[in-house]
UniProtKB/Swiss-Prot annotation:
Start-end of each PPR repeat: 188-222, 223-257, 258-292, 293-323, 328-362, 363-393, 397-431, 432-466, 467-501, 502-536, 677-711, 712-746, 747-783, 784-814, 818-852, 853-887, 888-922, 923-957, 958-992
Keywords attached to this entry: Mitochondrion, Repeat, Transit peptide
One matching Pfam family: PPR_3
Protein name: Putative pentatricopeptide repeat-containing protein At5g06400, mitochondrial
Annotated transit peptide: 1-77
Length: 1030
């Protein structure tokens, strides 16, 4: 059984197991004590630092004495990201995807479509239908208005309307549900591909699953684009297990796995940090002779460079030379950059030494990469030494000095940055605009407004043309000094210089005005944006409206909402045939979630992504000691530049260490030039609530209000959720009312948080949940599937099935899919043992019965097995197989639970083999059921095998898995193993509950292991102290 749930390398050729690149056995943890581990780690770090210093001295000696020849042909250059054809012409991966998309129809269909598009212009019809779908009419429903239209809803029209609804998935789904009920509707693969892309962009994986089931039921065959969209959607959601399953199903469906499918899969794995799996796919590609472009190679290099597999990384660089037809010089330049970005300075220096041994010419670009890597690693002295070598060789320029300046600014050392700035100017080289901008931003943050303005004037006097980022930085500086007129003057100078303000420039302007409550000026900006045909995003409107509500500007909110309506109307016109908006859907496959999408020209440095290395460094400091004075001393010595974005990420990653991170939050808030924003306060409130430190949570809320930070519905939703999840639902209700008393209108997320906690067993309040749910419906919000499932499940559990049934009609009227609503209701009935009532509801359903059967048959099977009717359950499974619906993971899990309960281990193994045969990926619930099942049979070793194998297959154990395994181990007198699981939970950032500690404590005492029981109590006390401040 141990091998039964091991990761399926059957995805690949079995003969390749001998020379696998990666091993999946590295998940088990060492049982050494923390003290030994810290000593070993410290010694290792010291030894590595000594080795790097020695190596660096050797490299500087080599570089300092070598004579460099300037060869323009060997400089790093950008290449077209694509595979190389037989004749040497580079082929874009994007082009390949679009070719795949064209394969969705047969050749005859393609010709018919072409003729149809040539003869008929559908755009006026599409525009009119879209205006109805996206229109705002509270009196007449969308469906009623669509019925009055006299158009034929041809597949091309439907597809283009859906493309225009790309950013409003709930409206797209309502239109889709309506139009497919029309007579003569054609279930075309293009329409489903569009809907899958919309659902994927909205991160609604339930909708994706429903659409796939619907395609299968209606006999709509998937084309190659369908498969690539599904792989992309699951990859973007970091559901790697599902992505792998789709990839395998694509293989079994008879489609040839081309470069596009592999490309998306490898990118997904790289983004998820699963370099080991990416290497497996890469090796399979190489064996099949399939290649991809330079861009994916760079992603693979960056991902693998973070590991210790230096030889593998270098072999990939060799493949880049062979396949992408780039020079060794360029390939090793990319390799050097990957090492530097990953913080592998030692490996980077060793690579430089190897290149010199090969007598490869090192140009200025290599030096720049090395300087940037040293600056990122906070080795400024070493970076300056490399710059000095460049200067002696006359390779230094304003670009490399700009890198040094950025390094000092990251350390908040403005004085040294200015010294280097003077060095650039004295050398006679003009500094870059980005260097000016970065220094100005830091001066404005340090309240040195005059110096920042003087620098801007100096830049203009020296003939250096500022870009939109530089001008926006000066505008923000003026607004920080409440100089609105001057800010407008500088902002207007953009157009005078021929620079068109970007939406980012406008959004920064708006947010700065919000902080000083200049709402008349904001209305002026919105009107200007509308006149300039610049789309105003909904999050900007929400920000402004929330700020106005907080300050009691209710009259002006009406004006803002009118502008928002005009802006939405303009968006519809802008989309035209849907291409402008739907181009983002294409990027889901073509440029899916690529890290290089953010461009510095469009994004000010201060707003760029947080450096992960900085986050890791601060988290390491916070976890290194429980003595706050020592931690504070280490933070003071840190060279990291603290920004609100960085603070948010630190709080998110280290939230289990509530005491340390909240002290850090307080400490960083008192630093000169730093101020918390709303997002930072929201995250700190969440951290305090997760640690049940409600006194500190409220204290942070009041501090947030005193500091003038914008308190939105999200802030209240966080507090409501934190109170509710611990059973303090009365306080959660009072907090919700307190929010409304302050004039804030509840948002969809606020309603969801309150209803969810009111429906939970701990602190359940059904009456208040019903009242709040009805208020949410009256407010015009459509609940998501998860909320409906919680609410209907709660009503059925307390026996209030009448209200649950009446709720179905209300949901149907507001656009919630009726079939989905009934499937949730039937599921709830099955879970409380009312199987006959569930079957009665299923039989009397007047809608699309076959679709409801697909949605509910797993619940029916579960209910039958709970009652002990195995034969009827198997008959149900077989009947669904006959109509083409295979059992899902839910059905298989129910069968496994039943067979374990009946002690039929052979049947369990048989069911597992069927799952593997049908490529049905086990879920975390399946693994948990197997662990508990083996423990119930006294097979402890097999339970541990199942637990470890789930990690090897990429499924991480969650809190419930750990809790149930701990309970089973303690019942089996294996409490010492359960104690190890507590430690593993803490290592993974999962906080054990009080019940977990109590179970282990009692188990150890029953077994006579009193010393270990005291250790369990000490762990609990340490965790409480670690998570709370009050």
């Amino acid at each position: 059984m141990k091998a039964l749930f091991r990761f399926k390398s059957c995805l690949f050729d079995p003969t390749r197991r001998r020379n696998q690149l990666v091993s999946f056995s590295g998940f088990s943890k060492s049982s050494k004590s923390n003290k030994t581990r810290e000593t070993t780690t410290t010694s290792k770090i010291q030894a590595e630092a000594t080795a790097i210093t020695s190596l660096f001295n050797e490299i500087t000696e080599i570089l300092g004495t070598d004579v460099v020849k300037l060869d323009e042909t060997t400089r790093l250059r950008s290449h077209v990201s694509g595979a190389v054809s037989d004749n040497g012409v580079s082929v874009s991966c994007t082009e390949g995807v679009r070719q795949n998309a064209a394969m969705g129809f047969s050749g005859e269909d393609e010709k018919a479509q072409k003729v149809l598009h040539e003869e008929v212009d559908f755009s006026p019809v599409v525009h009119e239908i879209t205006s109805v779908v996206r229109g705002d009419d509270v009196l007449v429903s969308m469906e009623d208005r669509l019925e009055k239209l006299s158009f034929r809803f041809e597949p091309e029209i439907v597809e283009n309307v859906l493309k225009r609804c790309f950013k409003v998935p709930h409206l797209a789904m309502r239109f889709f549900n309506w139009v497919k009920q029309k007579d003569g509707f054609s279930h075309r693969v293009g329409i489903y591909n569009t809907m899958l892309s919309i659902a994927g962009e909205a991160r609604n994986l339930d909708m994706v699953d429903e659409l796939v089931s619907e395609m299968e039921k209606n006999g709509c065959d998937k084309d190659i684009r369908t498969w690539t969209i599904l792989i992309s959607v699951y990859g973007k959601a970091k559901k790697i297990g599902k992505g792998l399953l789709v990839f395998e199903k694509m293989r079994k469906s008879g489609f040839e796995l081309d470069a596009t499918a592999y490309n998306i899969m490898i990118r997904s794995l790289c983004i998820a940090g699963r370099g080991d799996l990416a290497l497996e796919f890469y090796k399979e590609m190489m064996e099949k002779g399939i290649t991809f472009g330079l861009r994916t190679y760079k992603m693979l290099l960056d991902c693998i460079a973070k590991s210790e597999k230096v030889d593998v990384v270098q072999s990939i660089a060799d493949d880049m030379v062979r396949i992408c037809e780039i020079s060794e010089h360029d390939a090793f330049g990319y390799l050097l950059k990957s090492f530097c970005v990953s913080g592998k300075i030692k490996e980077a220096l060793e690579l430089i030494r190897e290149l010199k041994n090969k007598e490869m010419c090192l140009d200025a670009k290599y030096f720049e990469i090395l300087v940037k890597g040293l600056c990122r690693a906070n080795r400024m002295v070493d970076a300056l030494e490399i710059v000095d070598i460049m200067k002696r060789r006359k390779l230094d320029d304003s670009n490399v000095y700009g890198i040094i300046i950025s390094g000092y600014l990251r350390q908040n050392d403005v004085s040294k940055a200015l010294e280097q700035f003077e060095v650039i100017k004295k050398s006679g080289r003009p500094p870059r605009v980005s260097t000016y901008t970065e220094i100005m931003q830091h001066l404005f943050k340090l309240k040195q407004f005059e110096k920042g303005c003087n620098l801007f004037n100096e830049m203009i006097e020296n003939g250096i043309e500022p870009d939109s980022v530089a001008i926006t930085a000066v505008v923000a500086g003026h607004l920080g000094q409440n100089r609105v007129a001057e800010a407008w003057k500088v902002f207007s100078s953009m157009e005078e210089k021929g620079i068109k303000p970007t939406w980012k420039s406008y959004s920064i302007f708006v947010k700065e005005l919000c902080r000083s409550s200049r709402y008349d000026e904001i209305i002026k900006i919105f009107n200007q944006m509308h006149a300039s045909k610049i789309v105003i995003r909904d999050d900007i409107f929400s920000w402004v409206i929330s700020s106005m509500e907080k300050n009691g500007e209710k009259e002006k909110i009406h004006l803002i909402k009118e502008i928002q309506k005009r802006s939405n109307s303009y968006c519809d016109e802008l989309n035209g045939s849907g291409k402008a908006e739907f181009s983002q859907e294409e990027e889901l496959v073509d440029d899916y979630n690529c890290p290089q999408l953010v461009q510095q020209s469009a994004l000010p440095p201060a707003l760029s992504a947080v450096d992960k290395m900085d986050v890791q460094e601060i988290c390491r400091v916070l976890s290194s000691s429980r003595d706050w004075e020592r931690t504070q001393e280490a933070l003071e010595k840190s060279t990291v530049q603290f920004t609100p974005e960085l603070v948010v990420e630190v709080l998110r990653h280290a939230k289990i260490q509530g005491n340390a991170v909240l002290r850090f939050f307080s400490w960083v808030g008192k630093r000169n030039g730093y101020k918390h924003n709303s997002e930072a306060y929201n995250m700190s409130i969440k951290v305090a609530g997760c640690g049940k430190d409600f006194k500190q949570m409220r204290s942070l809320f009041y501090e947030m209000r005193r500091q003038g930070c914008l308190i939105t519905q999200d802030t209240w939703a966080i507090m409501i959720m934190q109170y509710g999840r611990t059973g303090l639902t009365n306080i959660a209700i009072r907090t919700f009312k307190e929010m409304k008393d302050m004039g804030l209108i509840p948002s969809s997320s606020t309603f969801k948080c309150l209803i969810t906690v009111l429906c939970e067993k701990k602190g359940r309040n059904v009456e208040e949940a019903t009242r709040t749910f009805r208020e949410m419906i009256r407010s015009g919000f459509v609940p998501d599937r998860e909320l409906v499932q919680d609410y209907l499940g709660c009503l059925c559990e307390v026996g209030n099935t009448k209200d649950a049934k009446s709720c179905l009609d209300s949901l149907g009227k507001i656009g919630f899919p009726v079939t989905v609503a009934y499937s949730i209701y039937i599921r709830a009935l099955c879970r409380i043992g009312k199987l006959e009532e569930a079957l009665s509801e299923l039989a009397s359903f007047e809608g699309e019965r076959s679709l409801l059967d697909q949605y509910t048959y797993g619940s029916i099977v579960h209910g039958l097995l709970q009652r002990g009717d195995l034969q009827k359950a198997l008959d149900k499974v077989n009947s669904m197989k006959e109509i083409g619906t295979k059992p899902g993971v839910h059905v298989y899990t129910s069968l496994i639970v039943y067979f374990f309960k009946e002690k039929q281990l052979e049947k369990v193994l048989e069911t597992c083999q069927k799952m593997e045969g049908e490529s049905c990926e086990p879920s975390v619930v399946t693994y948990t059921a197997m662990i508990c099942g083996y423990m119930s049979l006294g097979k402890v070793e097999e339970a541990w095998n199942a637990f470890r194998n789930m990690e090897e297959r990429g499924t991480s154990p969650d809190f419930k898995t750990y809790s149930k395994f701990i309970n089973c181990l303690c019942q089996a007198c294996k409490s010492e193993d359960a104690l190890k699981l507590l430690s593993e939970m803490l290592d993974k950032g999962i906080a054990p509950s009080t019940i977990n500690f109590r179970t282990v404590f009692y188990g150890l005492n029953r077994e006579g292991k009193h010393d270990l029981a005291r250790i369990a109590l000490q762990k609990k006390s340490a965790l409480v102290a670690q998570r709370t401040v009050s």
